[in-house]
């Protein structure tokens, strides 16, 4: 079929239908969302869970959600800004932090449903492929599907770091090793050791060592927070190992105490009737005193 020019006449504008708001804003890929949300018709009221991963400039957000007509219901959430509690105070948006956030989400969710002792996941991090399988006589493994949003799902993306953390934490998420760091598209082989290095922050540590030797000023500028918190390249692996153990030990979210805010009043409050009468009496008395002084003088 040849090129057909769109004639923008009166009928075109009269029948024009705008796209969904979140599509107009460039926030939602409805082609992907439809496939992530719609459940099999023979499963009736069973929700289809999604593991939502979003990476911002300063944070990594991981959520487990399911769709309802009223809107998405969030079952559990974990954030990279919670990691300082577990000993990771710097680099909260790198691949290693994404793994920790995914692990925290998985352990928190399973703890909430009382399944954390049944599905321990992969305790020893080796970067290799791991899949959670349901145990006979126990509740089935919690299954969900990765929702990467509008992120480019290229090999080594941080979204897959969060996915790997959640899988190692005990969630059943369908995936392959093709998008993990360490996969070679030419030889079609996966190097688990390269992936493990990324999970343990060794790629960052290697770059830190390189900058320390080559450009001291660039190192001080780029890794100022690492220097401030006394984090050296040799400490990185141990820091993440301790963080993984701490997350497994206590993944429960602690609510912050509510701050009591004293309300300030910027305008004058209304006067009662008694106050108004008293004010009038004071003004009268003041006026009469002024009249008397004027008469005396």
Swiss-Prot record:
There is a cross-link at residue 220 (Glycyl lysine isopeptide (Lys-Gly) (interchain with G-Cter in SUMO2)). The keyword RNA-binding applies. It comes from Rattus norvegicus. The modification Phosphoserine is found at residues 185, 272. There is a cross-link at residue 220 (Glycyl lysine isopeptide (Lys-Gly) (interchain with G-Cter in SUMO1)). Residues 253-297 are annotated as: Disordered. Component of the ribosome, a large ribonucleoprotein complex responsible for the synthesis of proteins in the cell. The small ribosomal subunit (SSU) binds messenger RNAs (mRNAs) and translates the encoded message by selecting cognate aminoacyl-transfer RNA (tRNA) molecules. The large subunit (LSU) contains the ribosomal catalytic site termed the peptidyl transferase center (PTC), which catalyzes the formation of peptide bonds, thereby polymerizing the amino acids delivered by tRNAs into a polypeptide chain. This is Large ribosomal subunit protein uL18. Belongs to the universal ribosomal protein uL18 family. The gene is Rpl5. One of its GO terms (cellular component) is ribonucleoprotein complex. The modification Phosphothreonine is found at residue 232. Signal peptide: none annotated. Residues 258-268 have a biased composition (Basic residues). Pfam families: Ribosomal_L18_c, Ribosomal_L5e. Component of the large ribosomal subunit (LSU). Part of the 5S RNP complex, which is a LSU subcomplex composed of the 5S RNA, RPL5 and RPL11. Component of a hexameric 5S RNP precursor complex, composed of 5S RNA, RRS1, RPF2/BXDC1, RPL5, RPL11 and HEATR3; this complex acts as a precursor for ribosome assembly. Interacts with NVL in an ATP-dependent manner. Interacts with RRP1B. Interacts with IPO5, IPO7 and KPNB1; these interactions may be involved in RPL5 nuclear import for the assembly of ribosomal subunits. Interacts with RRP1B. The modification N-acetylglycine is found at residue 2. GO terms for biological process: negative regulation of protein neddylation; negative regulation of ubiquitin-dependent protein catabolic process; positive regulation of gene expression; positive regulation of translation; protein stabilization; regulation of signal transduction by p53 class mediator; ribosomal large subunit assembly; ribosomal large subunit biogenesis. It is found in: Cytoplasm; Nucleus, Nucleolus. GO terms for molecular function: 5S rRNA binding; mRNA 3'-UTR binding; mRNA 5'-UTR binding; mRNA binding; structural constituent of ribosome; ubiquitin ligase inhibitor activity; ubiquitin protein ligase binding. The modification N6-acetyllysine is found at residues 5, 48, 220. Transmembrane segments: none annotated. Keywords: Acetylation, Cytoplasm, Isopeptide bond, Nucleus, Phosphoprotein, Ribonucleoprotein, Ribosomal protein, RNA-binding, rRNA-binding, Ubl conjugation.
